[in-house]
Amino acid sequence: MSEKQFYLLQVNDALFPIGGYSHSQGLETYIQRGIVHDVDTAREYITHKIKWNLAYTELLSARLAYEAAKRNDLEELLKLEEILEASRIPMEQRDAARKMGSRFAKTIEKLNLWVSEKGIFREYLEARKGKAVNHCCVYGVFCEEMQIPLEDALSHYLYAQTSAVVTNCVKTIPLSQTSGQQLLSGCYGEFDVILKDIMSKNEEDLCLSAPGFDIRGIQHERLYSRLYMS
């Protein structure tokens, strides 16, 4: 493996300090309402989450950001950021994407990686100074700047985000660690379908989702007791 492939593993690792563990993205509402309460309901939730919410918002955004960065199209990147800002309906999830994006960028800065001072990554962050930087977007730009193949960037991101959802289910429902691993490995058959599908989509498909995820995200803001920030 090359050095850049290890960096790809690092930025997708659960220990990479962007605060993703603090967010359930509405899952906590599903659990408190008894909708997600065991292995079977967790499997249904995870499958729909990755096929709709994750695929058409985060994964597609990462791909579009990567391709815009490859073209050095700063205007398209800024447009993508504005679309993401406008399309995330739950307030807590907007804030989560901003915070994780900001922390991702700041952590990358501290790693002293080879990132051109005149490259699109620096130009993009400078243009977004004082504004929101979404995690999926900055991730896509970073991967292109590091010359990481698009397929690798997307597959690692999909695995990492799915693993995070499974971990939240295990901790919060709760489920056994073995059940969590079974749920995660059970998603692998969907990964290839999702990755192939997302490569054929364009900006018009961005943020296509199931409204139930947004509704539970909004309801999370008013839960009496909460373990997660979203």
Please report, for each region that a protein language model flagged, where it lies by residue:
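Short, mixed-charge aromatic SLiMs
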Residues: 44-57, 87-88, 127-133, 161-170, ...
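A contiguous pocket-lining binding segment that forms or flanks enzyme active sites
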Residues: 128-173
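C-terminal auxiliary extensions adjacent to catalytic cores
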Residues: 160-230
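Internal, conserved structured core segments that host functional sites
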Residues: 59-64, 71-143
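A short glycine/serine-rich beta->alpha loop
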Residues: 8-17, 46-52, 86-93, 122-129, ...
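Inter-helical turn/loop segments and adjacent helix faces that build the functional surface
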Residues: 30-40, 111-118, 145-153, 172-179
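Glycine/small-residue-rich interface belts in oligomeric ring/scaffold proteins
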Residues: 4-72
